Amino acid sequence: MKVTRKRAQRERRHRRVRRKIFGTPERPRLSVYRSNVHTYAQLIDDIAGHTLAAADSREVGEAESRVEAARKVGELIASRAREAGIERAVFDRGGYKYHGRVAALAEGARAGGLKF
């Protein structure tokens, strides 16, 4: 029961944040999803409803920790964004706290050249 409530609270926070955040083709939404093991990131154009670029921790290979893997995912999504001609994005933390893996992904994306 507790897990269900925790997930519902995260989804509620995500809906609240999503009311304010919207991605466009010029400035897509950088959406973050965190599972127990992996971290996923997508650049989404909400107008067309398309994913412009995606990356996840399964692609980055071995990492010392999940936080380090998330940082590498951020760098990978930033490089894919540059390839797609995207320089700026809107960060969507997905209802998660801006801490740990979510913050590491954001820092990695910024280090890779993505601005938000």
UniProtKB/Swiss-Prot annotation:
One of its GO terms (biological process) is translation. GO terms for cellular component: cytosolic large ribosomal subunit. Keywords: Ribonucleoprotein, Ribosomal protein, RNA-binding, rRNA-binding. InterPro entries: Ribosomal_uL18_bac-type, Ribosomal_uL18_bac/euk. It holds the Pfam family Ribosomal_L18p. The keyword Cell inner membrane does not apply. Belongs to the universal ribosomal protein uL18 family. Part of the 50S ribosomal subunit; part of the 5S rRNA/L5/L18/L25 subcomplex. Contacts the 5S and 23S rRNAs. This is Large ribosomal subunit protein uL18. It comes from Rubrobacter xylanophilus (strain DSM 9941 / JCM 11954 / NBRC 16129 / PRD-1). The lineage of its organism: Bacteria, Bacillati, Actinomycetota, Rubrobacteria, Rubrobacterales.
